[in-house]
Amino acid sequence: AMMILASKWIEFLLSNSTEQKRFLSNTYGNAGQERIKLIIQTLQKFIDTLGDKHVFITRCPGRINLRGMHIDTHGGFLNLMTIEQELVLIGHPRDDDKFCIYNLETKHKPFLSSFRSLQKEYPLQSSWKDICHHAQNRTDTSSHWHQYIIGTLLRFAQQTKRPLTTGIEVVVGGDIPEGSALSSSHDLCIVLLQALMYN
């Protein structure tokens, strides 16, 4: 992924240059020009919230599972197709283990935590089953989207068998309707995993 200033990304996306058209075509096919608005809104929220920093962009399209019923999380087979709506993440690496994750939708509270504090509540040496059981029994359900973030961070650390010593600050934005079975929560996990791999 390419890291340039967030403001330069906006300038590039608005440029209508040959490079911009090629970039959008390679990323989105014929729908490129329609997708710019969401990316620019998310970049602008990043600048307004975290400053004009060198950032990377990850994305994941929404998906339709023709069998439905969360069968993938129960070991079943999928019959998928993607849709144009997507989730976009604008990210910047940090030098410490803090994670500052904001959503374009203000109804979602920011997730602000360090990996060290997460490990106190969810020790990495615990089994994944124990971690999930503990998460299900939490009394604070005020921000369910935090659970997807916590699960992604812990699963990544457990799979790579190392604590996350460098955090990230990100803004996510999407146009996938929540609760519509188009995998908006799945996409949040995927763009966050992409950001962690980049980091």
Question: Residue spans of the language-model regions?
Answer:
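ATP-binding N-lobe of GHMP and related small-molecule kinases
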Residues: 2-186, 190-199
